[in-house]
Design a protein with these regions (language model features):
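N-terminal Rossmann-like NAD(P) cofactor-binding subdomain of oxidoreductases
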Residues: 1-192, 229, 293-294, 298-306, ...
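Charged docking surfaces used in two-component/phosphorelay signaling
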Residues: 65, 154-350
């Protein structure tokens, strides 16, 4: 089995390498990035080729390709990989809303990745945990309206912003300790350290950001509810990793807390934490490198009169579940994974 990763030197590429070693430990790897280089990962050194080499007439084919590139490069290389015989899972926004390309969350609509499918779009890092939490509620009670506020880590913006964030944070605290300067005096309001940015991504003419549009449109497509009433406010917060979402839900049919808790706990790749205090959801270490969504803080909305309006919190590692883990689970529909935790429900042993 030959597996290709485009964008192997990035944050998602690194997580893919870790998971591939668990899922397909004997696979041959073909790694690509913007230029020829070497990559140290997990105690091994890998040769990385320039992605442009795939455009040569003698470029080798393979079985499975993960593409973790910006939109313009995904549009350039995904068709070429399909042409070379790969089944392709693309992390960019390029194909997500294309009606001819399935947008898949393992545990929600993985049936869309069939034996005939050659290209699958991997959803945005906030959409994946949100739809994992919503799907068991949709199945049992129906969904009316959804309102989401997300708090998204710096790593969701990419390696360069994360590196700058770490450098500026260390520099700021060092200056505080050595020069006695106040943290607030050191901050650039245009930079991430110490600031909560009230949008994530570029805003359009309506004022909504690209992250907010993705969350709304992708959720409708994945849940197969094109008319779902859903609105989102996405913020960037000064933490390195981990996305949090506070979700207000209106169900079509009323239910009590026990019924909703049972539904959430039954969801594939969901770890449900009972109790309204959010215990188990607050620490960064709780979500770091976890391959599931954490759901908790379930409580009835204070305007509820019939058991239809509820609030809850969803947390996940944006680089793992929100990107690499979902991609690997999708691929397990075609190539069964050695690690059962990286399979999808219809293929996993009970």
């Amino acid at each position: 089995m030959r597996i290709c990763i485009l964008g192997a030197t990035g944050l998602v590429g690194s997580e893919l390498l870790t998971l591939i070693a668990r899922a397909w430990p004997t696979a041959e790897l073909a790694l690509y990035a913007s230029r020829d280089q070497t990559l140290a990962h997990g105690g091994d050194t890998h040769e990385v080729q320039a992605a442009s080499s795939l455009e040569r007439g003698d470029a080798p084919g393979g079985d499975l390709a993960f593409v973790a590139l910006d939109d313009q490069y995904s549009a350039r290389y995904c068709p070429r990989l399909v042409e070379l015989g790969y089944r392709v899972i693309d992390k960019s926004n390029t194909y997500r809303m294309n009606p001819e390309v399935p947008l898949v969350v393992a545990g929600v609509n993985h049936h869309r990745a069939t034996s005939a499918t050659k290209l699958v779009a991997n959803p945005n890092c906030t959409t994946i945990p949100l739809t994992l939490a919503l799907e068991p509620l949709r199945a049992r009670f129906g969904l009316g309206e959804i309102t989401v506020s997300s708090y998204q880590a710096i790593s969701g913006a990419g390696l360069a912003p994360l590196s700058r964030f770490v450098d500026m944070t260390v520099e700021g605290f060092t200056r505080m300790q050595t020069a006695g300067e106040l943290w607030g005096e050191l901050l650039d309001p245009a930079e991430y350290p110490g600031n909560v940015v009230p949008h994530s991504g570029k805003t359009d003419d309506s004022g909504f950001s690209s992250e907010e549009r993705k969350l709304v449109n992708e959720s409708r497509k994945i849940l197969e509810l094109p008319e779902l009433g859903i609105s989102a406010q996405c913020c960037r917060v000064p933490v390195p990793a981990g996305h949090y979402e506070n979700v207000w839900i209106e169900l079509e049919r009323g239910a009590d807390a026990e019924e909703i808790s049972e539904a959430l706990a039954s969801g594939p790749f969901v770890h449900y934490h009972p109790g309204a205090d959010g215990a188990g959801l607050t620490a960064l270490a709780t979500v770091h490198r976890r391959d599931h969504a954490l759901v908790g803080r379930l409580r009835k909305d204070n305007r509820d009169t019939d058991g239809r309006r509820w609030c809850l919190t969803v947390a996940a590692d944006n680089l793992r579940l929100g990107a690499a883990t979902n991609a690997v689970r999708i691929a397990s529909a075609w190539f069964p994974a050695s690690d059962p935790l990286l399979g999808i429900p219809s293929l996993r042993q009970a």
